[in-house]
Amino acid sequence: GAYTGMPNKKPKVPTLRQAKVQGPAFEFAVAMMKRNASTVKTEYGEFTMLGIYDRWAVLPRHAKPGPSILMNDQEVGVLDAKELVDKDGINLELTLLKLNRNEKFRDIRGFLAREEVEVNEAVLAINTSKFPNMYIPVGQVTDYGFLNLGGTPTKRMLMYNFPTRAGQCGGVLMSTGKVLGIHVGGNGHHGFSAALLRHYFNEEQ
């Protein structure tokens, strides 16, 4: 990728400075990632994946999962994959996956919002081999709405000030007690997450 020239020093521990900055949001994020996040590889790269409930998880749409994915280095079959669009067929940049595994995810639907949320203090949590166990205070999150994301008109975008880099997609945007969205891109100095809304995971879907 664009950052292959970077040295391969991997900080394994989240820094305490960030913990102090964030307090409860940071603690919530660490607990959420420990229980519900995994590192996933598709043929399009490596991503952070968040498990939502039962055997359903979410990835950025551009991860384009195939019939199977590597989840924490284990091959796992994908039984179903839905690319989300709004009622007008506009891209929402999220793919919901149903995994072929016995273990169920802890149900976190109660932490998802019913509509796009703006907050003053958020944390972006990433866990991949390039960015292991990384928690970044991104401050204020605003409801950006419509964005042309890499040439694709995309809706329900949340924006924050953060110099994003390739390889952080799938990162989980959180505030205290809330899972706000999934990081899907950036323009160098702003990051964008797809709002992760509760009704995407209604049983009837």
From Swiss-Prot:
| Highest rank taxon of the organism | Viruses
What residues form the catalytic site here?
A: H62 (for protease 3c activity), E93 (for protease 3c activity), C169 (for protease 3c activity)
**Domain spans labelled Peptidase C3:** 23-201
Q: Which InterPro entries match?
A: PCV_3C_PRO, Peptidase_C3A/C3B_picornavir, Peptidase_S1_PA, Peptidase_S1_PA_chymotrypsin
The EC number(s) this enzyme carries: 3.4.22.28
The record, for PROSITE patterns, names: PCV_3C_PRO
Q: Which GO terms describe its biological process?
A: proteolysis; symbiont entry into host cell; virion attachment to host cell
What UniProt keywords are attached to this protein's entry?
A: Autocatalytic cleavage, Capsid protein, Covalent protein-RNA linkage, Host cytoplasm, Host-virus interaction, Hydrolase, Magnesium, Phosphoprotein, Protease, RNA-binding, T=pseudo3 icosahedral capsid protein, Thiol protease, Viral attachment to host cell, Virion, Virus entry into host cell
Of which family is this protein a member? Belongs to the picornaviruses polyprotein family.
Know the name of this protein? Genome polyprotein
Q: What is the lineage of its organism?
A: Viruses, Riboviria, Orthornavirae, Pisuviricota, Pisoniviricetes
